[in-house]
């Protein structure tokens, strides 16, 4: 009897020991799973890009799923001005920006002392002349008022477009930073309202004509290919670029975005979505 009781006690002890070991194994497996999950989360890289709403942010949205497949979370932050996106990249608040053309970038670096570089040419937005109170270029009266951007490069760009239409003559037709002071012939005595580029669509009803960047025209519901009275030629030097701070050109996430922006899928999207108002530059 004592032998049977001893055998029973030994059996119970063995079962409890095995159960305890089994519980420890399960806990360890759960811990391993949590650690693996943590490792997966740590592998996700966030890339922030400052962009104008249209077309830049619209184009970037198409890159989100492409980068997600590579473990990159593309965060697009929209800005409506031409200064903060650059200072944000310079200060490290944004990883990159996509809103500007090369002449503007070069002028910004020179005047602001920033260290920004372009890493990808993406598209061209032909600048256009739009009707305000005057319906056509032929009807433009003496002393008419024309709204133009007030930043150095886009102002020069607007004046070059007006010169191409025979409305004015500049002292140097290759001067990309021309101002009204560079006008040497103004047969219609045109007056120029120099305004922040983003605000120009809102003053169309108050001026005779307005020269508007295509991104702001699109944002205001205007189609550059059908609504503009005149538009830049396709050989425009104003290519819009992806920009980072100097030293970050080879960042893996940045290079992944460059590859996505230069893909056939993005080229086809730009061509189909904007119908000539935005032209791929790659």
What are these language model-derived features?
Residues 2-24:
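Sec-dependent N-terminal signal peptides of Gram-positive bacterial secreted proteins and lipoproteins
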Residues 107-119, 133-134, 206, 211, ...:
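Ligand-binding "clamshell"
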Residues 42-54, 72-78, 145-146:
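Short, well-ordered beta-strand elements
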Residues 154-163, 261-281:
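Periplasmic-binding protein-like
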Residues 76-87, 175-202:
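Short helix-initiation/N-cap motifs at beta->coil->alpha
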Residues 119-168, 267:
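A conserved helix-loop-strand patch within extracytoplasmic ligand-binding domains
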Residues 126-137, 239-251:
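A bilobed periplasmic-binding-protein/Venus flytrap-type ligand-binding module shared by bacterial periplasmic
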Residues 17-41:
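Bacterial lipoprotein signal-peptidase II cleavage site
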């Amino acid at each position: 009897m004592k032998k049977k009781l001893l055998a029973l006690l030994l059996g119970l002890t063995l079962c409890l020991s095995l159960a305890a070991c089994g519980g420890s194994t399960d806990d360890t497996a759960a811990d391993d799973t949590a650690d693996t999950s943590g490792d997966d989360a740590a592998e996700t890289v966030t890339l922030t890009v400052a962009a104008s709403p249209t077309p830049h942010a619209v184009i970037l949205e198409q890159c989100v799923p492409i980068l997600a497949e590579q473990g990159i979370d593309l965060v697009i932050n929209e800005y409506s001005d031409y200064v903060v996106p650059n200072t944000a990249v310079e200060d490290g608040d944004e990883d990159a920006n996509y809103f500007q053309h090369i002449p503007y970038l070069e002028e910004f670096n020179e005047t602001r002392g920033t260290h920004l570089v372009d890493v990808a040419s993406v598209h061209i937005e032909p600048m256009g002349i739009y009707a305000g109170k005057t319906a056509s270029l032929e009807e433009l009266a003496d002393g008419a008022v024309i709204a133009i951007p007030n930043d150095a490069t886009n102002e020069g760009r607007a004046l070059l477009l007006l010169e191409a239409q025979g409305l004015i003559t500049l002292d140097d037709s290759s001067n990309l930073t021309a101002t009204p002071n560079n006008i040497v012939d103004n047969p219609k005595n045109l007056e120029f309202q120099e305004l922040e580029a983003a605000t120009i669509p809102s003053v169309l009803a108050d001026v005779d004509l307005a020269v508007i960047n295509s991104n702001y025209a699109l944002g205001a519901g205007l189609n550059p290919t059908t609504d503009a009275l005149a538009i830049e030629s396709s050989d425009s030097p104003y290519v819009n670029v992806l920009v980072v701070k100097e030293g970050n050109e080879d960042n893996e996430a940045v290079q992944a975005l460059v590859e996505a922006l230069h893909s056939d899928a993005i080229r086809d999207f730009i061509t189909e979505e904007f119908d000539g108002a935005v032209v791929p530059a790659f």
